[in-house]
Amino acid sequence: MPDVRPGRHELGQNFLTDRSVLDRIVHLVSQRQGPLVEWGTGNGAVTLALSELGRPLEGVEIDSRRAAELRRRIGPHVCIAEGDILRHAPPQDAVVVSNVPFHLTTPILRHLLASTTWRHAVLLTQWEVARKRAGVGGTTQLTAQWWPWFTFTLDRRVPSTAFRPRPSVDGGLLLIDRRREPLLPDTDVRDFQSWVAKVFSSRGRGVAEILRRNGVPARLANQIAQRRRRSHAPVLPRDLRAEDWVEAYAAV
């Protein structure tokens, strides 16, 4: 029986071919200290660019054939491991780099944020995902749940023409950095995230009413809502910033 393997497009990843974007990724990584890990090395475009930094680099690739091909092309200071990135644990204080397969964006982000060892991440995701995770135009529940421990920054938009095969949407460079001084202790992760989920799922005419229903004193709830008001439209949970969530949670 022939050895039939899925094509890279079937695996959900679009190769990055734009040199200016590769250079930007390398620049962002160079500003962050720590061993490098690339999730999903693919054809090695990002891997080869990162290898020029001369730092310890581990690549994780699920396609055994592509992993073997890349091992033959890469320098001795780079380790290419065959494996599932959703089961990979980055080394201590690592910088995680990934051209994230679009169909795995959410599980990869959840796995990354739940990992306790890495310090920085430079991710290429779908544009709308990058915007929402960075809280541009309104944040998501996932970002709000992790904001006390991480910062999320949108670096730039990456046009769909930068990829092969060309996807139907643009990409975006998303930076996630672990806070050196968390806004809440690690022991609060579970309770805080559960409370944020309740706030996002609660009904109300605006965030002040929603916060009051979830234990926040009325005066503080009104102050937070007023702080984020930009128009006559009601302020919603997606409009809150990290400091708002922490202040409200601490008052419950």
Model feature map: region roles:
Residues 198-252:
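C-terminal lobe and adjacent flexible extensions of AdoMet/dcAdoMet transferase-like proteins
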